[in-house]
Amino acid sequence: MTTTVETAAATGRVARVIGPVVDVEFPVDAMPEIYNALHVEVADPAEDGARKTLTLEVAQHLGDGVVRAISMQPTDGLVRQAPVTDTGTGITVPVGDVTKGKVFNTLGQILNEPEAEAQITERWPIHRKAPAFDQLESKTEMFETGLKVVDLLTPYVKGGKIGLFGGAGVGKTVLIQEMIMRVAKLHDGVSVFAGVGERTREGNDLIDEMTESGVLEKTALVFGQMDEPPGTRLRVALSALTMAEYFRDVQKQDVLLFIDNIFRFTQAGSEVSTLLGRMPSAVGYQPTLADEMGVLQERITSTRGHSITSMQAIYVPADDLTDPAPATTFAHLDATTVLSRPISEKGIYPAVDPLDSTSRILDPRYISQDHYAAASRVKGILQKYKDLQDIIAILGIDELGEEDKLVVHRARRVERFLSQNTHAAKQFTGLDGSDVPLDESIAAFNAICDGDYDHFPEQAFFMCGGLDDLKAKAKELGVS
């Protein structure tokens, strides 16, 4: 699919500039369509007046030939009456193998090497329709990650949408980095990463780590960081998704799409909505919140035989899961992995809350009976332990009955055994990551719940892989 437009480009003039919002006047019979990209040349004050091309995206038709556009770059140096060219098409990004190993901005410009060196042969527009209903794949298949807590308690769906919920600093980005490494190593798949409104330092660290671990060559990265205008942050997820769609639809590959952070996408939408003068709705969010989220999420799907599996980090403002931004995202997800601050404070990583996290396929219709039984058993023990917490806090553990003491004894071991060393956290811990097959996880948790390892000290269960790791740690602590 090509995006060339044969018509002569219409030219207008800048009528008004207010921050990233630019009003442009065109001839009434040559107004650009909504979502068209406009180009305007400016003298950049930061570069001693060097000329650069700004890209604007049409957001509203105000009438009488005037359109309101949102700038994708800072508008410093833009003046009234500056000539503006309508490109006749929306923003486009490069697609195909040329994107692997490269870092792009929202406009598809390469950031980590000279653009002239890249052999870009095809570009797709970022605004595209979702696949037709009859093209969708209805088969449900589990996506194994090698992380015990995820595979056992919140199994991911191949071609599904996975949400990583958590407040600041509980490990969302580390878990996403871990999944990128695991996908490249375990599944030999293509990954596309969208950095939406996150810290530039984190993006830089991610690129360095991916280069070191050798997975950068299988990944395309698209960044629209915190310091960029809201228009860029609102569109960066669509740019990355377009690259992923090409791998799925043309190259017939299974793709993993990582979005960090989907909350910043909502936040950018809220800023743009306010700039366009729309009336805010609940908690100050844009009135089109559900619609904008739906447009993005409906394109992330599986078509016949090929899938886009997406993992989305979702910042939870003030740890409040009822906030409209995370609440709107919930409706689209197949699995939710809730990262908990109290669990991260215990030093248990990944800090997944086993009772709050859910999965659509944690059901005997989709997974084995053994898997379902083990997951239910583990959740049951942890739930009972949680129910006893108040009594323990007030009266102490000695006031519990023998049966309850045994539940607490085993639950503490189960809780610690849910922790695991990850490849991405090696820089913090100095320990190699571990991969635990699902069958081994099921057998290990059944054995712990049966009391086979009641005589092992609690610290032996902490940050280990499978049963062999557990036994080796116990031996180090002097227990056979």
UniProtKB/Swiss-Prot annotation:
What EC numbers are recorded for this enzyme?
7.1.2.2
| A GO cellular component entry from the record | proton-transporting ATP synthase complex
Q: Which cysteines are joined by disulfide bonds?
A: none
SMART domains cross-referenced by the UniProt entry: AAA
Coarse class of the primary localization is membrane
| Classification via InterPro entries | AAA+_ATPase, ATP-synt_VA_C, ATP_synth_F1_bsu, ATPase_a/bsu_AS, ATPase_alpha/beta_chains, ATPase_F1/V1/A1_a/bsu_N, ATPase_F1/V1/A1_a/bsu_N_sf, ATPase_F1/V1/A1_a/bsu_nucl-bd
Membrane topology classification: Peripheral membrane protein
Task: List positions binding ATP.
Answer: 166-173
User: Cellular location of this protein?
Assistant: Cell membrane
The reaction(s) catalysed by this protein are: ATP + H2O + 4 H(+)(in) = ADP + phosphate + 5 H(+)(out)
Q: Where is the signal peptide?
A: none
What protein family does this chain belong to?
Answer: Belongs to the ATPase alpha/beta chains family.
Q: What does this protein do?
A: Produces ATP from ADP in the presence of a proton gradient across the membrane. The catalytic sites are hosted primarily by the beta subunits.
Subunit note: F-type ATPases have 2 components, CF(1) - the catalytic core - and CF(0) - the membrane proton channel. CF(1) has five subunits: alpha(3), beta(3), gamma(1), delta(1), epsilon(1). CF(0) has three main subunits: a(1), b(2) and c(9-12). The alpha and beta chains form an alternating ring which encloses part of the gamma chain. CF(1) is attached to CF(0) by a central stalk formed by the gamma and epsilon chains, while a peripheral stalk is formed by the delta and b chains.
Q: What is this protein called?
A: ATP synthase subunit beta
The organism encoding this protein is Streptomyces griseus subsp. griseus (strain JCM 4626 / CBS 651.72 / NBRC 13350 / KCC S-0626 / ISP 5235)
